[in-house]
């Protein structure tokens, strides 16, 4: 395979963003798919050799087992090219794996005598569904979950750091009851952790039961053997969950569930990106800058929230693909059609854009600094938010029309100051201790349990 320059790559994942998503290449490149197919074919061959009921093939020697294992661990780009050259003749990618294995092991007497047990009773989808199952499972466990955990840890760290930093909340874009910066970040840490936990426990299913899922060829060769039990053991030893009821293809319901889980996490992350973008726009966050960088080709002053915008854009692409995968993969005509094959090849693309969005979001989070002066200015100009606790205390003591009186005082009014609020409190028929408690309230300290909630996240 010739080296592809990022400058001429069709996909930006293999071009501009190559270095950001390279961790997925061992799982979703063409070479990775071929290697996983080789792995499954070899493991099936070895499993058959260890089964006493299949008398025509005996357990392989340690040297032969080592040779097989080396084919998997040392599988190279050159090996992949050899497989592709065979595929060019056969026009069948999985059959090319079988022929390549026979060629590579032709000089091994043990193997050559029983070479026809390679791909024994298998349909291509037996090999493919297990290969993709391993690719999807391992990419989740070794790449995607750690990347998501990095974001969660960044959010938890900032939530703790900013737990006591009050801010003016906004509902419908308008000033609302204060919170703290830390608590608002803690919300996303909590949401993403729930998504992480759900994603981590999704079992990927696999099958190896022949052309239409009934073990027809298996039973034709060995009619008294318990092929279902043998197949279940094989699938589970690979680390997948066995699906006993399939057509030619594994139904992909578990992969659809996984895609939905990724898409849901991405939707949460999209919400985070947009909220942070908004806080930067309000001036609540500043971004650390590098002197050498440029924010605009014409406006020298610009420091744009490009990391969150990049993340948002890639999340949109990722979710479009993930939703299509989720909706399309469980649907196949009768005992199968081939539409899932080309769609599954884009699993890595969907996760590539997802991983890129994770990287960009986390990069942006690590640039953030709270702009305490700007946040304080907003709070100092929003004494009307204390209408809520005042009318609530009035309700406690049975004062008439508390909500309506505070509405008349504050709604749509300008110039609501500390003095206006304190004058109103002074005229209330409530105990002096309550008046003092209300006078002690400010937009800065009327934050409820926000600080405590922020400090508790991640514990």
Go through each PLM region and give its residues.
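Amphipathic alpha-helices that form helix-helix packing interfaces
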Residues: 41-47, 104, 151, 155-158, ...
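Amphipathic alpha-helical coiled-coil segments and their boundaries
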Residues: 136-137, 144, 185, 251, ...
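A helix-coil-helix interface module used to build multimeric assemblies
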Residues: 2-218, 222-233, 295, 308-310, ...
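Short, well-ordered beta-strand elements within core beta-sheets of diverse protein domains
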Residues: 183, 256-264, 389-396
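Glycine-rich cofactor/substrate-binding loops
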Residues: 2-35, 86-87, 91, 283-285, ...
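Conserved helix-loop functional segments at active or binding sites
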Residues: 161-165, 198-201, 205, 236, ...
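Acidic, glycine-rich loop-and-beta core segments that form the ion-binding/anion-interacting portion
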Residues: 222-319
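A structural signal for small-residue-enriched, beta-sheet-centric alpha/beta enzyme cores
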Residues: 124, 219-222, 231, 237, ...
């Amino acid at each position: 395979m010739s080296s592809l320059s990022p400058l001429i790559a069709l996909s930006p994942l293999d071009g501009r963003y190559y270095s950001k998503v390279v961790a997925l290449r061992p799982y979703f490149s063409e070479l990775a798919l071929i290697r996983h197919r080789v792995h499954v074919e070899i493991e099936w061959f070895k499993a058959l050799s260890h089964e006493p009921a299949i008398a025509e093939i005996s357990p392989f020697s340690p040297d032969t087992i080592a040779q097989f294992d080396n084919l998997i661990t040392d599988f190279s780009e050159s090996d992949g090219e050899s497989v592709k050259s065979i595929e060019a003749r056969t026009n069948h990618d999985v059959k090319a794996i079988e022929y390549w294995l026979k060629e590579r092991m032709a000089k091994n007497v043990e193997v050559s005598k029983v070479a026809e047990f390679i791909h024994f009773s298998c349909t291509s989808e037996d090999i493919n569904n297990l290969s993709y199952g391993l690719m999807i499972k391992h990419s989740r466990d070794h790449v995607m979950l750690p990347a998501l955990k990095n974001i969660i840890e960044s959010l938890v760290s900032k939530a703790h750091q900013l737990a006591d930093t009050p801010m003016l909340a906004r509902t419908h874009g308008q000033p609302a009851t204060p919170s703290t910066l830390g608590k608002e970040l803690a919300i996303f840490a909590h949401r993403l952790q729930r998504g992480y936990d759900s994603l981590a426990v999704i079992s990927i299913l696999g099958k190896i039961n022949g052309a239409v899922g009934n073990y027809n060829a298996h039973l034709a060769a060995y009619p008294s053997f318990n092929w279902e039990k043998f197949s279940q053991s094989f699938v589970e030893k690979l680390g997948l969950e066995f699906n006993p009821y399939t057509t030619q293809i594994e139904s992909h319901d578990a992969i659809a569930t996984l895609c939905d889980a990724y898409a849901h996490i991405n939707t949460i992350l999209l919400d985070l990106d947009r909220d942070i973008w908004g806080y930067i726009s309000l001036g609540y966050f500043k971004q650390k800058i590098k002197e050498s960088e440029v924010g605009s080709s014409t406006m020298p002053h610009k420091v744009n929230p490009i990391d969150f915008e990049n993340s948002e854009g890639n999340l949109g692409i990722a979710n479009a693909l993930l939703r299509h995968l989720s909706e399309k993969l469980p649907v196949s005509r009768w005992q199968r059609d081939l539409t899932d094959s080309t769609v599954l090849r884009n699993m890595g693309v969907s996760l590539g854009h997802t991983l890129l969005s994770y990287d960009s979001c986390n990069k942006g989070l690590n640039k953030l600094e709270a702009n305490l002066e700007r946040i304080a200015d907003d709070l100092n100009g929003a004494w009307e938010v204390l209408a809520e606790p005042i009318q609530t205390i009035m309700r406690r003591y049975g004062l008439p029309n508390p909500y309506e009186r505070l509405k008349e005082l504050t709604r749509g009014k300008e110039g609501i100051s500390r003095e206006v609020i304190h004058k109103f409190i002074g005229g209330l028929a409530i105990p002096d201790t309550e008046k003092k408690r209300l006078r002690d309230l400010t937009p800065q300290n009327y934050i409820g349990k926000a600080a405590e909630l922020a400090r508790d996240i991640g514990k």
